[in-house]
Structure formats: C-alpha cells, structure tokens
Amino acid sequence: MSNLEYLEYSAKEPMTLLRKKFNNGEDIYKTSPTTLTAEDASADVMYLKYVFENAYSGFSYYDKSLFDTAFAAIVKSLKDSVQITPDQLIDVICSNLSFITDGHLALTTADYGNGFYKELQTYVSDMPVYKVRDAYYDAKTKKQVLFDDAVRTFPTLNNSIADSYLIGIRSKNPTEKISVKSDGKDEVLPLHRIMSKEQTEESLVEERYEENTAIITCSSFVGDSEEAMKKLYEIGKKCRKYRHVVWDLSNNLGGNSEFPKHFLKGLYGDVADTVKVLELQSSLVHAKETGEIKDIPYHFEESPHTPTKNGDLFTGELHIIINDMVASSTELALRWAASYPRVTFYGCNSLGIGHFGDLCIYYLPNSQIVLWCPQKVFDAGIQETVGFEPDFWIDSYDVVSTVLNHISTK
C-alpha cells in the first residue's frame, strides 16, 4: 500500500464510531484468518510500521534506528515462514520491539494478546520493623536488623508501634527471598508479593456511610454517561460534610478521566488539572479520529490547563486506597488528588500505565490484529512500570478495614 492507501484504509473505521462501540461494551474484534502467508504478514508489518511512525505518541521517545532495525528483522524472519498464525505474528512483533516500555501499547485478537510492559512488582517479608533514628529493629525481637541497598523499607501502619515498616524489594522478576543480618547473624527472609484487594465485580461507584466517615468505592471508570458523571459529582458534594472520606480505587484500571474529576469537583469544588498533556497531530491521527483525509504536519500540541486552582470546600481528610491494578486515567486521578491538602494514600504501588495514553484502535489489514495505539503523552510524574507509591504500604487483602481502624484511633 502507498501512504495514501494507508490513510484511506485507516479512515474507514474512525474512532468516533469505535470509541462509542467500546464504551457501550460492544465487541470491537473481527474474525482473524487461521494462518497468513509470509507476504500478507509482511504487508501487515509494514502497515504497523507506518502507524508507529505517524500515530504512536511514544515513537519519538526512542531512537528511530531501533524501530528501523526491529521492523527489518521482523520482515526478514517472516520470509522464512510458509505460513504464520496471527498469534505467532503478534509474538514475533513484540519480541523484536521489546525495547519499548508502554503499558497501553498492545497487539490483540479476540482470544490472544501481547504487549510491551513488565511491571515492577513489590515483594515483602513477614518481618515488621520499626525505626529509631537511622537504625531498624525487628518489631518482635527488638533486635537490630541490617540489610544492603537492594532491600527497601516500606512505611506501614502499626497502631502499637510508631514509625513501622515492611521490608522487601521491588523487582520485575519474581523474588523469593532476601538476606539480612539480625543481631549480627545472617538470616534469610522469605518474600511474597504484597497482598492487595482481590478482583470483584466492576462498578462505577458504591457508597456507604459510618458516623463521621464516608466510604466510596470506584472499581471502573469505563463509559461516557453524563448522568453517571453527575452522580459522582453529587456523591462528592455529599461527602463534604464528613470528617473522613475513604476513596477505594483498588482494581480500577481506568477509562474516562472525567469520572474521577467529577467526584473531586463535587468534593472540593474544583480541580486544578495541571498535568501536562501533549496531543500528537498528524494526517493519520486525524484520519483515524474523524474519517477525513487531510494533510496535517506531524507535531505535538499541548492541551490547555484550566482551571489552575483547586477548590477548598472539603475541610476533612481524604484517604485513598490503591493497588497494583490501578492504572491509566485512575493514576491521573491520583496525581490530581495528591495536589490537595490532607490526602493520604494506602495499599501498594499502582500499575504504572499511563504515560502514553488515549488509545486509538487500528486493524492490521490481513490478520485483523488490533493495535491499541496511544496518541497522547500524559506528564503526570508517574514512571511507566514503576507506578504511584502510597504513603503507607498495607500487606492485606482488606485495606479498607485497616484504614478504618486507623481512622478510629485519631
């Protein structure tokens, strides 16, 4: 295909229609062939290269030669194939482009997918410690504990001991143990992945109220219902009268950032959206968004920041619960919330997906593989794969109860 043919093909199914289907829960996948010829697979790869170069917001963050080398290697490897399945094609592409770190960018079919993300997991031991000046002590034996720089301490809540910590490590590879010195002797501590709330049925909002505390749970922000946004605003407004508001965002992978923004507007009166957002503009992005072919030079435009001041109508304390299934626009909400006074975060690290976002859907012509392609850059200060770290790390499946117990002691 020529560049014009690529544009015309991409414009046939604009995001104005696909986004509506996705938000309504409709299936956006097409039937993929069982196998592809090497020629058809190579044609898909060349279309993918065109999309990367003209519509992927993360493309300019890497050296172009890396992409050129990777795509040349993919095409060369396909020449040795008589037939290849769509799933195999996905894996060949992802393995050659493994230098990319992007949790949104992905290639999928209806029953298979692969991407460009490897989470920095948190592993902790069962040994709680506390800190006195610059030294750490075992909370049970009271003996001093020494460890090297690879081992981290994670502030936690302990109603009986101040300045308490979990000890462990953050790693992209499974880690089963760490070595420490306790009372001058070497000791090996088993590690486990930090506990977090188990997945439950997704819902936009659930609310309950206990004396001076409001508990608001939002496990999904998918959709675009103005009525639902208004509901979140009214719930936020209702919460102003409470001394404590617990906002449980566990397992919320994101969706539409207007949902959390409406809750915060209701609670505080306004949200200072100071996160810098860069929108990629190009002929391909325009064609995919609108279905219109138009010559637009490749460039980034910064979205305007309005308003520039947070509201102050809530005078209580906001307690936000997060875990390693919090991502994308929900992480954006964490950055907004962190700009208010008297806000504390509990749980564990967020997923760290969202630096590149606002997804467009592209179909590779022959395989019908779906490319989920970010077209914006969100500079929220949350590093991809690292995530947002809480003020207090809670090794529990029920962080809400831990936080409520903590609040009751205030």
Predicted regions located by residue number:
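Glycine- and acidic-residue-enriched helix-capping/beta->alpha junction motif
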Residues: 237-302, 338
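Short, well-structured beta-strand/strand-turn elements
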Residues: 104-105, 327, 340-355
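BRCT (BRCA1 C-terminal) domain core and associated BRCT-interaction motifs
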Residues: 345-400
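Extracytoplasmic/peripheral linker and loop segments enriched in polar/acidic and small residues
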Residues: 67-75, 79, 309-310, 387-410
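Short, conserved helix/loop micro-motifs enriched in His/Cys and acidic residues
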Residues: 307-321
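Active-site-proximal beta-strand/loop segments in catalytic clefts of secreted hydrolases
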Residues: 217-221, 248-252, 278-282, 321-325, ...
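Flexible, low-complexity junctional segments that flank or bridge functional domains
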Residues: 1-245, 249-253, 258, 262-265, ...
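Cysteine-centered nucleophilic/redox motifs
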Residues: 96, 318, 326-341
